[in-house]
Amino acid sequence: MGQKINPLGFRLGATQGHHSLWFAQPKNYSEDLQEDQKIRDCIKNYIKKNMKIFSSVEGIACIEIQKRIDLIQVIIYMGFPKLLIEHQKIEELQMNIQKELNSVNRKLNMAITRIANPYGHPNILAEFIAGQLKNRVSFRKAMKKAIELTEQAGTKGIQIQIAGRIDGKEIARVEWIREGRVPLQTIKAKIDYCSYTVRTIYGALGIKIWIFVDE
């Protein structure tokens, strides 16, 4: 039976790049890795806390961290960056992260990049499906709506999988749907992937999304 490898790790160096770009001494490596996780968690928690009530999608596609001796550069790729830009929240977020890291001799720089087609990115799409499932929308309806949104974003194919106690059924099961082509075996095919856990009143559901972006 074929083993299912993570599509992003499988394509590293071919069509995928790293989201953390820095070098460290072996003895400091784990500390730097934990620091990266702290930064990512801090950003996600801040946006979740300050999110508008009506928007169920945070819209973070990915967070890129670049480090030098005296500088930490953080680039947040967002689908809907209004929240941070309009209310000057980015300075507040920057101060929060600086407090969390407690690094005096390093400057922290933050930038926000807007994504052209937010629903062409699996993380944002997974958040959309999670919001639908939390509002007790039928999983098939949520999947079909998600596929419509990605088609508008101009992708070549998509596969969505939801696993768990779907619709509150006693027995957990896996449901999936595919539209277009999703060549997982081809390394040169640019495939975006994400796995996301959503907590519903019936328990946790796992959402996995593969999007075929380009050859």
From Swiss-Prot:
Single Gene Ontology BP annotation: translation
An MF annotation (GO) of this entry: structural constituent of ribosome
Domain KH type-2: 43-116
UniProt xrefs under InterPro entries: KH_dom-like_a/b (IPR015946), KH_sf_prok-type (IPR009019), Ribosomal_S3_C_sf (IPR036419), Ribosomal_uS3_bac-typ (IPR005704), Ribosomal_uS3_C (IPR001351), Ribosomal_uS3_CS (IPR018280)
Keyword presence, Signal: no
Location in the cell: Plastid, Chloroplast
Keywords noted in UniProt: Chloroplast, Plastid, Ribonucleoprotein, Ribosomal protein, RNA-binding, rRNA-binding
Record Gene3D superfamilies: 3.30.300.20, Ribosomal protein S3, C-terminal domain (3.30.1140.32)
Highest rank taxon of the organism: Eukaryota
GO CC terms in record: chloroplast; cytosolic small ribosomal subunit
Predominant localisation class: plastid
UniProt-listed Pfam families: Ribosomal_S3_C
Signal sequence segment: none
Self-association and partners: Part of the 30S ribosomal subunit.
Membership in a protein family: Belongs to the universal ribosomal protein uS3 family.
Protein name: Small ribosomal subunit protein uS3c
Organism of this sequence: Morus indica
Gene name per UniProt: rps3
